[in-house]
Design a protein with these regions (language model features):
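N-terminal secretory signal peptides that target proteins for export/translocation
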Residues: 1-2
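Bacterial N-terminal signal peptides
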Residues: 5-14
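N-terminal leader/targeting pre-sequences
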Residues: 18-170
């Protein structure tokens, strides 16, 4: 191998490593500290794919959001802060000035207490930058008691926080 070829190879290595953003996972727990679900986070073109799976939650629609602090102190989970909103937008998919990067579609839980959902967070990343879920304060996924109306700022009238999980690198 020539010195020139070796130099090109060494320059390309950081580019390949930088292109591979990490993935993430959150274990969701209720106010009693019992595990009620998981969420996975994978990089995708233009954002982050979120897959949520829950059990033992009340039936019905529940607002789910990414919150701006990686803390889930029960019973109210207020330690998770407000919604993840690096672009300083208003709340909700139906708000002309929205949505927060942390806004996700409602989660519909069946009569059996279970639900699965997949969504893409546009403008978020698992790499570095303002939209990173792994920024200085980290982030958490929060499940709310009520449905999100997808327009009322700051949280869509989605009620109390009933489950929370810190998003960690996988």
């Amino acid at each position: 191998m020539t010195i020139r070829a070796l130099s090109v190879s060494l320059i390309a290595i950081p580019l390949v490593v930088a292109a591979a953003d990490p993935s993430g996972k959150a274990v969701l727990k209720n106010a009693e500290g019992k595990e009620v679900g998981t969420a996975t986070f994978t990089p995708t073109k233009g954002g982050v794919k979120v897959q949520v799976q829950v059990a033992n939650l009340p039936p019905g629609k529940h607002g789910i959001h990414i919150h701006a602090v990686a803390k889930c102190e029960p019973p109210e989970f207020k330690s998770a802060g407000g919604h993840f909103n690096p672009a300083a937008k208003k709340h909700g998919f139906h708000n002309p000035e929205g949505a927060h990067a942390g806004d996700l579609p409602n989660l519909t839980v069946g009569e059996n207490g279970k639900a699965k959902a997949t969504a893409t967070m546009k403008g978020a990343t698992l790499g570095e930058g303002d939209g990173s879920l792994f920024g200085p304060d980290g982030t958490a996924l929060v499940v709310h008691a009520d449905p999100d109306d997808e327009k009322t700022d700051p949280a869509g009238n989605s009620g109390a926080r009933i489950a929370c999980g810190v998003i960690e690198k996988k």
